[in-house]
Curated annotation (Swiss-Prot):
Family to which the UniProt record says this protein belongs: Belongs to the citrate synthase family.
EC id: 2.3.3.1
Protein name: Citrate synthase, mitochondrial
Catalytic residue positions: H304, H350, D405
Keyword Repressor tagged: no
UniProt catalytic activity: oxaloacetate + acetyl-CoA + H2O = citrate + CoA + H(+)
BP GO annotations: carbohydrate metabolic process; citrate metabolic process; tricarboxylic acid cycle
Binding residue positions for oxaloacetate: R359, R431, R451
Amino acid sequence: MSFLTVSRLAPKLLNSKNATYFLVAARNASASSTNLKDVLADLIPKEQTRIKNFKQQYGKTNIGQITVDMVYGGMRGMKGLVYETSVLDPEEGIRFRGYSIPECQELLPKAPGGEEPLPEGLFWLLVTGQVPTEEQVNWVSKEWAKRAALPSHVVTMLDNFPTNLHPMSQFSAAITALNSESSFARAYSEGVHKTKYWEFIYEDSMDLIAKLPCIAAKIYRNLYREGSSIGAIDSNLDWSHNFTNMLGYSEPQFTELMRLYLTIHSDHEGGNVSAHTSHLVGSALSDPYLSFSAAMNGLAGPLHGLANQEVLVWLTALQKELGGEVSDERMRDYIWNTLKSGRVVPGYGHAVLRKTDPRYTCQREFALKHLPNDPMFKLVAQLYKIVPNVLLEQGKAKNPWPNVDAHSGVLLQYYGMTEMNYYTVLFGVSRALGVLAQLVWSRALGFPLERPKSMSTDGLMTLVGAKSG
C-alpha cells in the first residue's frame, strides 16, 4: 500500500478500531524528511506510474454524457478536468485530499495554545496527501518566512498605485510583476527538460505563497492605514500570525480566525473560476505568477469572490430597515419581500452543494465560541433558522442552505476589519494554497495544454438533428 493510499484511507477509518494505526501511518509516511520538495520527489514517480497504468487500461472508457444544456450552462456538471487536491461532494462538502473540514481541524497541527489548523499544514496535505507532523509544518513556516521579502520594484509599484484602484487590481498587478523573479520562466528559456518542470514550479509557488501576505498587507496599509509600514517578518511566527501582524491586528483571536479563514478558503475542487483559470493558464506553461494572477482576475468577479461583501451589504440594509432585535415573523416577511422583488438572499445556495456548507458550519462554531452575543452574528444565526424554510417554500432553490460567504464577513467585521472591498484579497491569499499545490502536480504529471472543442449554435443544432430556423 502506497503512502498516498494510506493517507486517503485514513479519513474513512476514523471511527474504526484501526483509526489510530492508519492516522499514525499517514503522519509517519514522510516523517523521515521535513523538506517538502524531497517528499514530493519521492511521491511523484509513484503517482506517475499509477496514472500511466490507469490510462493504459481505461483510457478509452466513457465517463459520462454531455448535454446541450451543459454546453450552454457554463459546463455545470461536466466532467472535464483532473484536479487532485480536493473534491466537492454535493451532500458532504469539500474534502481536502480525502479529509473533511472537521477532520482537518482535528488532525492538522496548530500553533502553540491555538485551536485552529495552521494553513501550512493544509498546504502540506494538499501537496502530498499526507497529514504533516508539527516539525514538517514548522519547516514550511520558516521556509515561507525566509522567502517572503518583496523585490524593490514591486514595493515601488504598490506604493505608487492610485488610492482609487481596487485592492484586487493592485493584488493581481503586483503578482504579475513578481514574474521577473520566476525560476520556471528562466529555466524554461534555458531549455530545462520537461521532467524537471515541476521542480521550478514548486520553487516559484513556494516563493509566491510566502510573498502574498506581504503584498496583501502593503495594499491594506496603503489604502486604509495611511501607508504605514508593514514591519518585518518574524521567522519564529507562523504564516497567518505574520500576516495579521503586518495588517496591524494584535488580537490573538483574530489571528486564530485568520488561520481558520486561510485554511477553509484554500481550495474548492477544480471547476470554480479561480482554480480552473490557474489550471488553464498554467497548461500553456505560463509560470505560477502569471497563472495565479489570472486566477485572481477571475476571483475579483462579482459572481466568484465578492459574495461575502454582498452578504454584508444586504445584512446592513436589513438591520437599518428592521432595527435591532427582530422577531422571526418580521424577518420571514422581509425575506419573502426580498424574493418577491426578484432579488436573492445573498449567502444562500451553491452551484454544487446541496447541504449546509461545512465552511459555514465551522465559522458558525467559531462565532458561537468567541462572539455569541455579537448583534450581527445573532442576525446571521436567525437567518440560518429562517431562510432555508422560506426558500424551500418558494420551491425554486436547488440548495436552500447557507454557503461560506454567509458568515465570513461578519467575523472579519467583529474584529475591526470593516473594509469590505479588501475581503476578496484575503480570499485570494488563501486560494493560492490549493491552486498552486495543484499546479505543481499538473506539471509533475505532464498535463497537456487545455484545448476543448467549441461549437456554434448552428453546429450544435446540426449535431443533434434540430432545425436551425
